[in-house]
Amino acid sequence: MELEFRSPSSPSEWAITSTITLLFLILLRKILKPKTPTPNLPPGPKKLPLIGNIHQLIGGIPHQKMRDLSQIHGPIMHLKLGELENVIISSKEAAEKILKTHDVLFAQRPQMIVAKSVTYDFHDITFSPYGDYWRQLRKITMIELLAAKRVLSFRAIREEETTKLVELIRGFQSGESINFTRMIDSTTYGITSRAACGKIWEGENLFISSLEKIMFEVGSGISFADAYPSVKLLKVFSGIRIRVDRLQKNIDKIFESIIEEHREERKGRKKGEDDLDLVDVLLNLQESGTLEIPLSDVTIKAVIMDMFVAGVDTSAATTEWLMSELIKNPEVMKKAQAEIREKFKGKASIDEADLQDLHYLKLVIKETFRLHPSVPLLVPRECRESCVIEGYDIPVKTKIMVNAWAMGRDTKYWGEDAEKFKPERFIDSPIDFKGHNFEYLPFGSGRRSCPGMAFGVANVEIAVAKLLYHFDWRLGDGMVPENLDMTEKIGGTTRRLSELYIIPTPYVPQNSA
């Protein structure tokens, strides 16, 4: 009798056949791999064959799942995700070891498929490999792009765009609910676009939509193509690269037109002319010929991408969560409004220069960063050399994830009311968000911390101050503040699962000038 082998005839049969084949190849590779001494890895949940701990992260939000597991297995926890070694850090002591004591050892970034596409093959500052190229980009960013003087130069842009937001809200009918989420996204896009590119570029909706979908892919949990790097076919079967490339093309078209238009405008501009945007600064450096590593157009686009991710998504997320917490905690909102309205009493508008005196507002912002860090799992690091942390072996190439969200809610550092929104906890507290206090890391710490901190905070401060000065806020009829849904959405940036709809009531200051 002759055996007959039939090809799969339906998509489901192909999927089953492909999955079985891939699992067989992974198992075979594991069996044939030479045995090495077992390292003293950090504790962690029991691993299953082939998949490790992947099953324990599926179906939830990664930073929340990791916090729950760390409460069982400890603040330095080992997870095996497919073929990859991962260590999750959930204590300030361990975070300090990673981000300060051994910062150089953990200065590398893991190469992830989504990041490769979004960052133009790791040409940006966030994901570029640690080395001379990254050092040059970091220097350019800190000195030329996001230095305090440069951020201050964008004050007029921030004031104009937030004034437009106020006027837009005033245009709604009395008692009408507004989609605050979409409005703050649009405002932060306007600020970032004008600061980076000189004007608000067409395609705002397409850009924001593409960016949201990309950030979802970045933080949506486990990418099987990343988890099994030895199985090259997974990059094709998973479809993740195709999806992200399609989204990236939408953004790239905008960046291409931005650079080309700037080049045309520069032909008629005198050298040394002021009011340069960030693209102008980068083109000046490109044309100067003074850099050790020349700036290509690809690098310029990658840096612009970083600016938009930091300026749009993270600033909007912080402002959205802050307003959500104020709605949920009306006594805090009243206190913040009283301070702002007393400071600007009799004035028709707010001047950014006077925001430094709003001490309670600064506490509100700090508390928002604590409970809702924009990046809950700090951008992953990778161990460059095998080392020992707190007595545990950390093999080379291990992926390190610092759970800033978990530490910000840990009762060990913040007391039994750690889950409560209470700005007063920062009164007379030396804790700040500049990366020196390792239980509080909204912008990370060390040489690979976020360079856009000053830009982001400035965007949030002026927007919130104007929104609280010009309007009173409430939920729709029948909705109770304490019942406001605060569920998070999966993504690289922490956003609300449901968009925030709230009702503004214009406030008219007495004797306004």
UniProtKB/Swiss-Prot annotation:
Xref: Pfam families: p450 (PF00067)
One GO biological process term: terpenoid biosynthetic process
Enzyme Commission numbers on file: 1.14.14.-
Summary of the tissues where the protein is detected: Expressed in mature seeds.
Transmembrane segment boundaries: 12-28
Recorded GO MF terms: heme binding; iron ion binding; monooxygenase activity; oxidoreductase activity, acting on paired donors, with incorporation or reduction of molecular oxygen
UniProt-annotated binding residues for heme: C450
Reported function: Involved in the biosynthesis of macrocyclic lathyrane type diterpenoids (also called Euphorbia factors) natural products, including the cyclization route from casbene to jolkinol C, a precursor for ingenol mebutate that is used to treat actinic keratosis, a precancerous skin condition. Catalyzes the hydroxylation of (-)-casbene and 4-hydroxycasbene to produce 8-hydroxycasbene and 4,8-dihydroxycasbene, respectively. Also mediates the formation of 4-hydroxy-8-ketocasbene from 4,8-dihydroxycasbene. Together with ADH1, triggers the biosynthesis of 8-ketocasbene from 8-hydroxycasbene.
Record-given protein name: Cytochrome P450 71D445
Lineage: Eukaryota, Viridiplantae, Streptophyta, Embryophyta, Tracheophyta
